[in-house]
Amino acid sequence: MKIGLCAYSGYKIYPGHGKTMVKVDGKTFTFLNSKCEAAHLMRRNPRKVTWTVLYRRKFKKGQEEEQTKKRTRRTQKYQRAIVGASLSDIMAKRNMKPEVRKAQRDQAIKAAKEQKKSTKAAKKASAPAPKAKAAPKAKAAKVSQKSAPRVGGKR
């Protein structure tokens, strides 16, 4: 037993009931009754007609009572150690006074600069004296072959 659906109202159409309309372009519409067919032919929007399934769906009619809203899980802050730094180290750095932190940073920068300076000096000392540049070679002039004379009259 095949149960169809009305093209206008959305209600079920049981065998032996309903009417099928075939348009010139080959589109088929099955209607439950003449009321649906007439409304379709008058080009009434089924979403605006109160007794259709589309209207009831649009305005959320006849649905079971809404379930309680899903509770969203809130993210919780969690502190843990990172590779190369234990939790106690991280907490100690965080609780440091800004002046102390600034002094530490300046000291670290100074040490890095000194290191860079010393490596540069060592590199300079070990590098040999630059050689005098050799005289550039003279380029040979290109020999171009003369093309054959054009033959064939006017173009």
UniProtKB/Swiss-Prot annotation:
Any Pfam family the entry gives: Ribosomal_L24e
GO molecular function, one term: mRNA binding
BP term (GO), one: cytoplasmic translation
CDD domains the UniProt entry points to: Ribosomal_L24e_L24 (cd00472)
SMART domains: TRASH (SM00746)
Keywords, in A-Z order: Ribonucleoprotein, Ribosomal protein
Keyword Cell wall biogenesis/degradation: no
Top-level taxon of the source organism: Eukaryota
Transmembrane parts of this sequence: none
Positions of the UniProt region annotated as Disordered: 92-155
Regions of compositional bias (Basic and acidic residues) in chain numbering: 96-117
Coiled coil regions in record: none
A single Gene Ontology CC term: cytosolic large ribosomal subunit
Entry-linked SUPFAM superfamilies: Glucocorticoid receptor-like (DNA-binding domain)
Biased composition annotated in UniProt, kind: Low complexity: 124-133
Family per record: Belongs to the eukaryotic ribosomal protein eL24 family.
Protein's recorded name: Large ribosomal subunit protein eL24
Naturally occurring in which organism (per UniProt): Spodoptera frugiperda
Gene encoding the protein: RpL24
